[in-house]
Swiss-Prot record:
Homotrimer. Silencing of DUT leads to high seedling mortality and affects plant growth and flower organ morphology in surviving plants. CDD domains: trimeric_dUTPase. Its cofactor is Mg(2+). It comes from Arabidopsis thaliana (Mouse-ear cress). This is Deoxyuridine 5'-triphosphate nucleotidohydrolase.
Amino acid sequence: MACVNEPSPKLQKLDRNGIHGDSSPSPFFKVKKLSEKAVIPTRGSPLSAGYDLSSAVDSKVPARGKALIPTDLSIAVPEGTYARIAPRSGLAWKHSIDVGAGVIDADYRGPVGVILFNHSDADFEVKFGDRIAQLIIEKIVTPDVVEVDDLDETVRGDGGFGSTGV
């Protein structure tokens, strides 16, 4: 059994700056444990889009309520990306648990917390180590904003909210 503090064969431990002899931005998803209760995110399978985020505490999400669940992690995602916290399908389907406010910008270095919403009529118990959400790293485009007098015409025009069918 491997020591908990040792990186797994697939995880690389980087120096403080994440640089290995060059100054190019690191392509790695960097994770810092803020306590011994933090669980390093993992993917459920080689083709999984999301990294599972785990609770660092025992907690409760009240019926029809919400709770902020700490992960005791800080992260750094590659430049040109952001991290999105998304629901886990099993929690959504079986327990009516959803997540909110799930954007983590590439320059944020604070603790990662997960806002859980309970849409059911029963309290939802969260235990230390439970996988509560998934973190998906997505590429982002941030073009300059240009104010214009008119927008280009399209077939759809200003039709919204069901205008293309139900």
